[in-house]
Amino acid sequence: WVQECSLSNAPGPSGVYRTEPFTRKDCDAFASEFVGRQGAEIRFGTPDVDYYDSRAFYSDHRTYALWVYYNDHSYEYTDYRVDSELRYSGKGGAITEDDLRAALDKLGIEIPDAASFVAVDESEGRYAFRAECVVEDDVLTNGELVCWVAEGGILYKVDNHLSVSTLHGNAAVISSQEAYERLCAGRFSWRDVPMFNYLSPRQVRVTDCKLEYMTDNKGFHQPVYLFTLSDENDAALRGGTGWTTFVPALAG
């Protein structure tokens, strides 16, 4: 293991945050209100609605498509009223932050004060509002709301994975240095361990480390240290880029 990023011996900020997960009934109520603001309705008991383990799907196949996730209330919305030639043209539209906020407001979407506007890719018409683990008054704002805009400044798709959660309880968090030591000892995400052991890289470069929050199916946002890694398999398996894994940040 080769460390190529700065680490600290200071403990990370304490705290576990939570958003009360949606039930199916909650999802139905949210979806009905959301599409209702667009002048559409949901026909329950028809193929317009489908439920999965982690999310629910709603679409009348003419006006809208909406995915709603139970654990953190995130959702993905597509406006089918915007001509498909515009949506699939590959050419994005230009839009200002104020105009995009106004378009989102018409959909009933509020942007948290902690989120900042970013022009992700203007040629593709992709814009976002992002917040990276911002904590204010025991409220955690994290993630991003991504918008797709067609030529003419027409908003047609919104992926809202910008979560807002409240402090559930304080819990000790290890330092990034201790997380690095656990990483080197193989104590990282169990999903990545089998492939790591199979590939058996000769040398792993640790190029970045940052504290993030992951949401479980009970709505808890728990701290983890996310590491960006690079090894000799990057070119053959990952298009020349590195890979990431995480180490749980709670002490113990």
Name these PLM-found stretches:
Residues 61-77, 149-155, 221-222, 251-252:
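Short, solvent-exposed coil/turn segments at beta-strand boundaries
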Residues 82-90, 95-236, 242:
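Segments that shape or occlude catalytic/ligand-binding pockets
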Residues 8-10, 220, 245:
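Compositionally biased, intrinsically disordered/low-complexity regions enriched for serine, proline
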Residues 240-252:
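Short, low-complexity, Pro/Ser/Thr/Gly-rich segments in the mature regions of secreted, periplasmic
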